[in-house]
């Protein structure tokens, strides 16, 4: 099904090199009213994250109009201002439209208290706006922790070592529309230094843990009263993302552990074994079809 994307977005050419011809999927002006999705991209390297989400949303069975949101109170240090001005919009600009779905990405600030993040106040305003005006929101990784803290006062805790790898995860509520077509176990990429804990979430009546891993802990939490999902991992990750992180960290110090269940035979020289892509596509398409696309 077609996508509507900003003209000239670099992700279009990147995906073309992966034999995903986004140009063939681009919507025409006379197409019917699309589902409008806004991605609040908090990651430093914007184009990489844009590509990850467009890659996965390109499988949508429904027409999607995808736009990107930026913060007013924080300037990106790793993405040119020209890129941000051309392809990103503020909350004030996007709030004039009817938004069906929102995705809030992770951010490399998990070592800080939420209140110490320089854009925390603005982020809270966006969270509140999304809750009142958007049909469904996906909060990813740090954003999941931030959303749980903002709405429900759920704390995050430092981990003794980085949760890093592809972890077997169990859908505890397989009847949830998000899990249509899922197996009894699915793999979820994780890359984080902090966690939220089951006991804190279970104290909140409005929250329900719908997926969990024996090794990596809480995986997906949903709001019972709203179409909000808090995902602690990164199903949107490209095949080489954890490899890039591993080699980046290895260049800084020697005590970096190999990401678990990621490389063939646990050997970085043999490359990653991609096991999560089909469930990642399924989860996002279920979100589009059954959560956004249904009244």
Ranges and model annotations:
Residues 101:
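Short, Asp-centered acidic motifs that coordinate Mg2+ and/or phosphate
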């Amino acid at each position: 099904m077609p996508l509507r994307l900003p003209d000239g977005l670099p992700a279009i050419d990147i995906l073309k090199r992966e034999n995903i011809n986004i140009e063939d999927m681009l919507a025409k002006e006379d197409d019917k009213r699309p589902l409008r999705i806004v991605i609040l991209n908090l990651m430093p390297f914007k184009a990489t994250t844009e590509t990850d989400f467009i890659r996965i949303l390109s499988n949508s069975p429904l027409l999607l109009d995808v736009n990107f949101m930026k913060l007013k109170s924080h300037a990106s240090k790793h993405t040119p201002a020209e890129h941000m001005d051309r392809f990103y919009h503020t909350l004030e600009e996007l709030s004039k439209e009817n938004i069906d779905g929102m995705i809030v990405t992770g951010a490399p600030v998990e070592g800080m208290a939420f209140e110490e993040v320089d854009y925390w106040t603005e982020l809270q305003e966006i969270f509140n706006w999304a809750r009142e005006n958007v049909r469904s929101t996906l909060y990813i990784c740090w954003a999941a922790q931030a959303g749980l803290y903002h709405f429900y006062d759920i704390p995050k805790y430092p981990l003794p070592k980085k949760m890093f790898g592809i972890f077997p995860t169990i859908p505890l509520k397989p009847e949830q529309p998000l899990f249509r077509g899922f197996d009894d176990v699915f793999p979820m990429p994780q890359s984080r230094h902090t966690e939220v804990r089951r006991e804190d979430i279970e104290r909140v009546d409005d929250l329900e843990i719908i997926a969990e891993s024996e090794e990596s802990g809480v995986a997906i939490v949903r709001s019972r009263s709203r179409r909000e999902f808090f995902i602690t991992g990164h199903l949107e990750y490209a095949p080489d993302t954890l490899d890039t992180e591993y080699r980046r960290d290895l260049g800084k110090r020697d005590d970096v552990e190999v990401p678990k269940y990621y490389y063939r035979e646990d050997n970085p020289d043999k490359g990653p074994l991609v096991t999560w892509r089909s469930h990642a596509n399924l989860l996002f398409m279920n979100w589009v079809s059954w959560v956004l696309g249904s009244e």
